[in-house]
C-alpha cells in the first residue's frame, strides 16, 4: 500500500517540478527529429503497404492495439484534467483576451500546466503509431487520417518553439476529445464495437466542434495581431499555419461526417455489398 501511495505522490510531484528549459532545448535545438519522424511516417503510409505488406498476411495486433489505446486514453484523461483545471483558473484570472494573446511564463512555462502541454506536443509523434497498426493489419489509411497526424505534429512542434499562448486552448480541447476518442477505440479493440457504436457520431461531432473552436481562436488572434491596436503576441507564422490547418480539418471532418451519418443508406447488392462489408470490418470509420 505504501508503494502505491508513494507512486501516486511521485506522479503528482513530477509535473509540479517540471522546468520549461527542457521544452526550450527540445523544440529549439532538436527540430531535425521532427523532420526524421515525418519522413519515416510518409514512407510508412506510401511505401510499406505496397512494398512490404502487399503479399503478406495481416498481423494480429489486437492485444497491442488494446494496450495502446487504453494507454493513450489514460494519458489524455490525465492531461485533460490538469489542463481544464489550470485553463479555467487562468481564464477567470486573466480573461479570454490576455489568456489567448499573451504568454504567462509564470503559469505556462514551468510546473504542472507546462508539463502537460509539453507532453501533449511530444505525444503527436508517438500518436503516429496509430497508423502503424492500420498498415500492418492491412487496413485502409484514408487521406484524413495521415494528413491529420502529419500536419498536427508539425503545427504543434512549431507552437512549442514559438510559445504561442493560444496553444494552451488547443491542448486543452484536444486532450478532452482524445480522452473519449481513444476510449472508443479501446472498446472497439476489445470486441465491443456494437455496444460503443452509438457514440461514434458524437465523437465525430466533437472533433468538428474542436475544429470550429480552433478556427475561431486563430481568427481571434489574427484580428488582434493584424488589425487591432491592442495587439497579440501569437507568432504570425503560427496564425497562418493554424488557419490552414484548422480550416482544412473542418472541411475534411465535415465531409467524413456527412459521408458516415447524413447520407441515406442505400442497400448495395452483390460485389458492392461485399466491398462495403469489407470496409466496415476493416474499421474505415474515423481518422
Curated annotation (Swiss-Prot):
It is a multi-pass membrane protein. It catalyses: a very-long-chain acyl-CoA + malonyl-CoA + H(+) = a very-long-chain 3-oxoacyl-CoA + CO2 + CoA. A motif (HxxHH motif) lies at residues 145-149. Its EC number is 2.3.1.199. PROSITE patterns: ELO. It comes from the Eukaryota. It is found in: Membrane. Disulfide bonds: none annotated. Belongs to the ELO family. This is Very long chain fatty acid elongase 4. It comes from Trypanosoma cruzi (strain CL Brener). The gene is ELO4A.
